[in-house]
Amino acid sequence: MTLTLFDLDNTLLAGDSDYEWGQFLIDRGVVARADYEAQNARFFEQYKAGTLDIHEYLGFALGPLAAHTPGDLERWREAFVRERIQPMILPRARDLVAGHLGAGELCAVVTATNSFVTAPIVREFGVPHLVATEPESEAGRFTGRVAGTPCFREGKLQRVDEWLAGLGLHFTQFEDSRFYSDSHNDLPLLERVRHAVAVDPDPQLGAEARRRGWPVISLR
């Protein structure tokens, strides 16, 4: 059996869905541009630099989910996927995913972006499993807090282990495993699989991939 994992943002997508969701909310007038846009950009730069405090960021990013009704959120999300995400889906990424699914492999998208934003994106690719940061909800409304461990850096590895355990599986049961990612933030999970693949990597991951002899590919 083969396990194949895909990062989402800047790997299967030509951009970052979490950042774009924030920009979409700004453009829709859901959040105030003056403050939100600057914070969104600041956190995105910290992510790229590897200095992001994930809990501070999630307090910011999940706030709008708690402030609005599920009906409004779902309506905005539908427009977001149509207007912002579908143009970001890379045809070569679709082909890559389809090839692994067609081979009968166990496939999942593993992303730090929350599952409310990413669930419909993952469905666009036909991937049956999503491992993502989970926003907490109570009585049908989001609370603005995180449920469980954020799916970021070492947390990605933990969340994948938990997901596999829920299926009655473990990494050691797979004859082969691979993970496709663009980011140095994903090194803990890249180091765990048999075959790490750097996809249009950031400079830090590109250097690490060359050092370790990992393949580097482009889906752009």
Task: Describe the role of every protein-language-model region.
Residues G15, E37, T51, H55, ...:
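Electropositive phosphate-/nucleotide-binding environments in soluble metabolic enzymes
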Residues S17-Q23, P70, T133, V146, ...:
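Active-site phosphate-binding/coordination module
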Residues D18-W21, L58, E138-R145:
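Acidic/polar active-site rim loop that often engages polyanionic ligands
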Residues W21, F60-A61, D72, V117, ...:
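Hydrophobic alpha-helical segments typical of transmembrane helices
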Residues F44-P70, E134:
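Short, compositionally biased "basic patch" segments
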